[in-house]
Amino acid sequence: MKYLKRYIILISIFIPGFLNAQDTICKLKGQMDGYAGLNIANPIKWQTGARLIPSFSIGKTWKTNLKLDAEISVNSFLDYQFSDWKSIGSDYGIRPYRFWVRLSSERFELRAGLQKINFGSASMLRPLMWFDRMDPRDPLQLTDGVYALLGRYYFQNNANAWLWILWGNDKTKGWETIPSSSRIPEFGGRMQIPVPGGEAAISFHHRTADLSGSVNPLIINGSGTYPEDRLGLDGKWDLGVGLWTEYSLIHSELDTAYFQPWTKLFTLGMDYTFGLGNGLYMATEFFRYSNANKVFDPGVNKTFTSLTANYPLGINKLGGILYYSWTDKSWYRFIDFQRQSDNWTYYLFLFWNPDRILIYNTGNENNMFAGKGIQLMAVYNF
């Protein structure tokens, strides 16, 4: 929160310029949702809650096509979980969700503040999920942002270059299990270029991880912080069917025998829309996650295959996601039915999964999608 104050000061510098401009455009929009779920466990568990995310944006465009805009939004939420009609947990609060200011033109943008940064070609099992935690099962695609300065430049041949600096982020993000040091900036970049039939990209990121408060200090040699470097490769092609691949190589210079220094993540996927009725969309991905002591060692692997499908039915849509773990021979099943009505969207979810979710690093051990159950959700967009 102390770093948020600095970004508030940054954005407040630009507010007088917005207010003094007659052609300034202001918008207030947002999203409100309520949900209730039942988990068929022993004993039976159920969950209910609500969320409100209002978003205020303000922007001004000059005759030179230079644009200055900002967005402020908060995530206010209330969640209760029960077992045998007795409360077993609750969570509520108001947290900053997005808080950024941006200067942009037709070919570049520079954005500073609390923002979402995500990229890559995969859709379900994403090795390049470095800064977000979007879950493909979540229809709202909510994810916390990161405090960052992000610059992007778009070339005439559709290539684009990214540079970023992150600072003040003391919680884990993406696939991380150890948070970054909030006092030491992280930095990286990405270059994406067009290739025959599609596009390809290379990404890099460097951070300093902080073990204090995460593991037993007796097993660590040195200060408890260590550098980590990431290299990412991805590509996507339209060859009649959609094909994509992602690869992430992570090296941690940690002086202890309790952690393996190399992490490798790989995804290969494809999708196609069949001309059946209103159009049946299907996609599949193969994913492998491994840790090793040396970069070319096979290490300890976790392997998953995923399949997703959706079919539109007028104002309704039926979809599903299926995962199979080749490591422990387990299935993850998720079916959703969606109905759209003006500003309202209604969802019905059915799930049948192992008692412990091992796919996504959400940081939440009490996952209501674990086991078997049903969930209802209503969403209002304004």
Locations of the language-model features?
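Outer-membrane beta-barrel architecture
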Residues: 53-57, 99-102, 150-152, 190-192, ...
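C-terminal structural cap/anchor segments
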Residues: 278-334, 338
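Transmembrane beta-barrel architecture of outer-membrane proteins
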Residues: 31-33, 49-53, 93-98, 144-146, ...
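Outer-membrane beta-barrel "beta-signal"
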Residues: 307, 368-382
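Transmembrane beta-strands of outer-membrane beta-barrel pores
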Residues: 34-40, 58, 62, 72-80, ...
